[in-house]
Amino acid sequence: MSKRAVIRFLGVAGLVLSGATVMGLIGGYRVNVTPSEPLGLWRVEKLRRPVQSGDLVFVCPPHNAFFEEAWLRGYLRSGLCPGWFAPLIKSVLALPGQRVEIADRIVIDGHPVSASTVSATDSEGRAIAPFAGGVVPPGFLFLHSSFASSYDSRYFGPIPDSGLLGLARPVFTFDP
């Protein structure tokens, strides 16, 4: 194959890949490469009702110093949310008005949550402080993943529901 043909092939392949990526983002598709939920292709489904406890959602984290530090530590991926963070894929665990207590695990309105162990250090041995607990304020959501090392609201607390993108629906996923 000539050098010119190789360049042409790579150019066309790059355009096709770029086009597929743009169409996927416009069409509401996301690829999950984190272990918090199954790996693979997911679709963002517009939420046509109030968010409920138990909903699996895509949400943009707020762009603030707390999440900048989380990004620097490698807890967040790069993406198209404000601050160039990738959307989180988490389950809604508590809604506004619900009481969250955190000790060695999460307790919502007096009910312990399974698979919610709280760690004092991250996977690299660095100290990580849990959320202090309290009542979820209006306009906020408390998020969770049953993955033991998940970076979720047990550490960053409730986040604004203004970042809610929609329900997370698996298209083609697998557990490694």
From Swiss-Prot:
GO biological process terms held by the UniProt record: signal peptide processing
Localisation: Periplasm
GO function term, MF aspect, one: serine-type endopeptidase activity
Any one annotated GO CC term: periplasmic space
Signal sequence extent: 1-24
InterPro entries: LexA/Signal_pep-like_sf, Peptidase_S26, Peptidase_S26C_TraF
Record's keyword annotation contains Signal: yes
Keyword terms: Conjugation, Periplasm, Plasmid, Signal
Any Pfam family the entry gives: Peptidase_S26
Primary site of residence: periplasm
UniProt key word Membrane: no
Family: Belongs to the peptidase S26C family.
Task of the protein: Involved in conjugal transfer of the plasmid.
NCBIfam families for this protein: PRK13838.1 (NF010412), TraF_Ti (TIGR02771)
Protein name: Conjugal transfer protein TraF
Record organism: Agrobacterium fabrum (strain C58 / ATCC 33970)
